[in-house]
Amino acid sequence: MAIPLVLVLAWLLPVVLAASLTQVNNFGDNPGSLQMYIYVPNKLASKPAIIVAMHPCGGSATEYYGMYDYHSPADQYGYILIYPSATRDYNCFDAYSSASLTHNGGSDSLSIVNMVKYVISTYGADSSKVYMTGSSSGAIMTNVLAGAYPDVFAAGSAFSGMPYACLYGAGAADPIMSNQTCSQGQIQHTGQQWAAYVHNGYPGYTGQYPRLQMWHGTADNVISYADLGQEISQWTTIMGLSFTGNQTNTPLSGYTKMVYGDGSKFQAYSAAGVGHFVPTDVSVVLDWFGITSGTTTTTTPTTTPTTSTSPSSTGGCTAAHWAQCGGIGYSGCTACASPYTCQKANDYYSQCL
């Protein structure tokens, strides 16, 4: 029986396999002993962007790849995904050692930067379009990379994290053995103090810091919601931004988007009643990175800042400019240094402005 010519030709055509998550064993110096996985779509953009996606404690690159679908949009927009995988301290990333917190100091942060350099070199990726995101430990690492390697990353989106250097000296990264004062929201500094930590991570750096987007649930019992306020204080001080106003029920009902400046450099999301794992809205993250929108747009708040009277605080202490001064669960200074007043962003966070 003769085989139809069309079937013969079809059999001879090359089979195009779907892209998949692939481990890279030799990406360069790896002081953090991390594993590297990448997703490279079959059709890359010209000078593709890079997104580094970092898992929570106890997780892995493969698990985080399956949790949030960044790979389907990668097929459409042609960007490359890097999934680092931690191997120590209950698979938590090192956000506590001076090595990881310091530019070119070593440990996990340098391993991740070397992964980025490998992808830029191997695939011709755009070094000006390197982004990062993560949940819990991955969100903490997003803050670490923003402080230690601001010249590598253009933007970041952190879900349930804490400020840069909040875990400094904790002794370990895992949630069981490490010092719990930061995760319980007990470490509170002024914006200037938090900013000093960042500047110490990369002495002499005078360039721009990554655009940052922070997400946190008000019912988080693993990493205190108070840490969102400290993140806000740290990065708005670094960027010199003031609170502009809120957008309620954005992007979901019960979520409040807190806008700083014109909204193009820093924004924070408060998720009412949400616990430790704030669901990741991939479309919002990609828009923030400028991958789907093509540019970073400014936003106009639907509410304006509410100025509240600064009450006297215990011990007569005063909060400095940019510092937190109120909110549910907050126990620090509630009076602001003159001439600033305590302005309410939402029920959980007020700031001296």
UniProtKB/Swiss-Prot annotation:
Gene Ontology terms: biological process: cell wall macromolecule catabolic process; pectin catabolic process; xylan catabolic process
Segments forming a coiled coil: none
Catalysis: reaction(s): feruloyl-polysaccharide + H2O = ferulate + polysaccharide
Keywords per UniProt: Carbohydrate metabolism, Glycoprotein, Hydrolase, Polysaccharide degradation, Secreted, Serine esterase, Signal, Xylan degradation
GO terms, molecular function: cellulose binding; feruloyl esterase activity
Catalytic residues in the record: 136
Superkingdom: Eukaryota
Changes after translation: Glycosylated.
Listed GO CC annotations: extracellular region
CBM1 domain sequence ranges: 317-353
Regulation acting on activity, per entry: Inhibited by the specific serine esterase inhibitor AEBSF.
Stated family: Belongs to the carbohydrate esterase 1 (CE1) family. Feruloyl esterase type B subfamily.
Function statement: Involved in degradation of plant cell walls. Hydrolyzes the feruloyl-arabinose ester bond in arabinoxylans, and the feruloyl-galactose and feruloyl-arabinose ester bonds in pectin. Binds strongly to cellulose.
Entry-linked NCBIfam families: esterase_phb
Protein name: Feruloyl esterase B
